[in-house]
């Protein structure tokens, strides 16, 4: 005797049903990842981020030896603070660019530069190299040291950066500006690109000549402010205590606009 075949009832999944399933899968993924994240990031809250900017960038050196490049992201909580906790995050943005320390003075090389440089490029993060300037050293030697360490730049790489933070012993404000201009002109002539100048808002006001600030893109450091105290700036380093997912500890965090980043 043939058994009567039972009809299988078709289940129709609506758009709302698909959304619910996706939300459930996402919640399960968070639950699985949660212990791992908590174990790695005990202190998960960092600086408050400024409003109105959409391109985040980091600047790194030997002090950030271990970076999970494929995981890099800036997460903020409900109060606008950076966080490493995915369960507290209400907004997530990618890290769009990274400035990497290459050299200092006339002979020092950052031991993690080449590794960071390679990994940033490999993971599609726009990269730039910076030189920490020493006003007590020969400017042309410093420029050549930077050029030899960094090597050629691709079209997608950011312009070279001159990091000016102090007037070193044995030099003056006048000497610093004269030497900085030699470095900038030497590097610009070599790469065919106008370098960026990094400094704090107060140092720019007190020490840098208009010949520098009016003719080169400015990357300004100014913490704890709604906007930087600098008339002409392209990139703003707004904190040195940010939490960035993929980096243990605190890190410098910067903002700019998409258009500015595109034009550099």
Which functions belong to the PLM regions below?
Residues 158-229:
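Catalytic domains of cell-wall/extracellular-matrix polysaccharide-remodeling enzymes
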Residues 39, 43, 50, 54-184, ...:
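Substrate-binding cleft of extracellular glycoside hydrolase catalytic domains
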């Amino acid at each position: 005797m043939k058994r009567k075949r039972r009809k299988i009832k078709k289940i129709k999944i609506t758009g709302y049903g698909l959304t619910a399933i996706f939300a459930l899968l996402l919640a399960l993924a968070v639950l699985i990842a949660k212990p791992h994240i908590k174990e790695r990031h005990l202190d998960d809250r960092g600086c408050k981020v400024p409003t109105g900017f959409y391109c985040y960038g980091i600047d790194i050196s030997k002090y950030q030896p271990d970076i999970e490049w494929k995981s890099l992201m800036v997460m903020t909580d409900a109060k606008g603070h950076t966080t490493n906790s995915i369960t507290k995050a209400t907004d997530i943005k990618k890290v769009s660019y990274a400035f990497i320390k290459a050299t200092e003075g006339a002979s020092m090389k950052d031991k993690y530069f080449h590794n960071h440089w390679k990994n940033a490029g490999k993971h599609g993060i726009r990269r730039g190299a910076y030189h920490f300037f020493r006003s007590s050293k020969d400017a042309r030697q410093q420029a050549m040291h930077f050029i030899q360490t960094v090597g050629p730049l691709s079209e997608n790489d950011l312009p070279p950066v001159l990091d000016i933070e102090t007037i070193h012993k044995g030099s003056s404000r006048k000497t610093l500006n004269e030497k900085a201009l030699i470095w900038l002109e030497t590097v610009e002539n070599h790469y065919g690109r106008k370098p960026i100048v990094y400094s704090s808002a107060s140092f720019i006001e007190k020490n840098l000549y208009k010949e520098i600030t009016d003719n080169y893109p400015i990357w300004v450091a100014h913490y704890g402010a709604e906007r930087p105290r600098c008339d002409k700036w392209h990139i703003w380093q707004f904190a040195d205590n940010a939490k960035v997912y993929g980096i243990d500890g605190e890190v410098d965090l910067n903002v700019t606009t998409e258009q500015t980043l595109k034009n550099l």
